[in-house]
Amino acid sequence: MHCPFCAAVDTKVIDSRLVGDGSQVRRRRQCLVCNERFTTFEVAELVMPRVIKSDEVREPFNEDKLRRGMLKALEKRPVSSDDVENAINHIKSQLRATGEREVPTKLVGNLVMDALKKLDKVAYIRFASVYRSFEDIREFGEEIARLQD
């Protein structure tokens, strides 16, 4: 690590500690040339898989798109923003855990439906009706019946 004061390359770590939930490491460093001390934070770089759309087009995973879709389904429902963020983080973890470089949108959609089913049944039905392209009332009824089982 370069010293931010004198740009020397030689620095040593004096102290390391986990920060917050343990996903970050705080390090105190000292320059071996000018003896100045400074703090750095390290975070693991987690790469999300690319998404394969139904028309075979591949695009980067878009967390904002995921959030917008979930929030649209959850509109005017009694679900906290913390619960939504936790669900989004869980979905992202599940996608990374596949170990795949690319995942189909079907997998992402199913993970969203699983998360919504746990958060709010009405939001789940809203999302499922669009995601599965319900054509009539019968399909709504069948999905609601599956929820009640």
Swiss-Prot record:
UniProt cross-references to NCBIfam families, sorted A to Z: transcriptional regulator NrdR
Stated family: Belongs to the NrdR family.
Keywords assigned by UniProt, alphabetized: ATP-binding, DNA-binding, Metal-binding, Nucleotide-binding, Repressor, Transcription, Transcription regulation, Zinc, Zinc-finger
Pfam families per record: ATP-cone, Zn_ribbon_NrdR
Single GO molecular function: DNA binding
ZnF start-end (unnamed): 3-34
Positions of the ATP-cone domain: 49-139
GO biological process: negative regulation of DNA-templated transcription
Protein source organism: Serratia proteamaculans (strain 568)
Annotated cofactor note: Binds 1 zinc ion.
Function summary: Negatively regulates transcription of bacterial ribonucleotide reductase nrd genes and operons by binding to NrdR-boxes.
UniProt name for this protein: Transcriptional repressor NrdR
Cofactor dependence: Zn(2+)
Gene that encodes the chain: nrdR
